[in-house]
Amino acid sequence: MLQELSVAKVADNSGAKEVGIIRNLGGSVKKSSNIGDVVICSVKKAIPNGIVKKGQVVKAVIVRTKYGIKRENGQHVSFDDNAVVIIKEDKSPRGTRVFGPVARELREKGYLKIVSLAPEVL
């Protein structure tokens, strides 16, 4: 669960390395976002010749959280870090690679391209 002003790693090769969450989309009083939710972020750290630059405001989808998620079958899945993938307006990723595992819930929320690029789906 990530809230406003949380810092997350970027799990793709779009050029950003770290982002800060500005706003959780999906409601005016929504306090936190979980895996599969779209957030508006500001790029805090970036590589010099990447697609996105430092200070740029982008949309991203959350792919990993330390808080984790509880599934209907009783499993509790959590990760070592908080990570996002930067997306375009049509829900497709801006980068061409995704690093690290992603949660299975992304497939249910319609992010099939991110799931297919990921090396492991938990």
UniProtKB/Swiss-Prot annotation:
Pfam assignment, any one: Ribosomal_L14
Keywords tagged on the record: Ribonucleoprotein, Ribosomal protein, RNA-binding, rRNA-binding
Origin: domain of life: Bacteria
Entry's Gene Ontology BP terms: translation
GO cellular component terms, semicolon-separated: cytosolic large ribosomal subunit
GO MF term list: large ribosomal subunit rRNA binding; structural constituent of ribosome
Subunit structure: Part of the 50S ribosomal subunit. Forms a cluster with proteins L3 and L19. In the 70S ribosome, L14 and L19 interact and together make contacts with the 16S rRNA in bridges B5 and B8.
Protein family per UniProt: Belongs to the universal ribosomal protein uL14 family.
Function: Binds to 23S rRNA. Forms part of two intersubunit bridges in the 70S ribosome.
Stated name of the protein: Large ribosomal subunit protein uL14
Gene for this chain: rplN
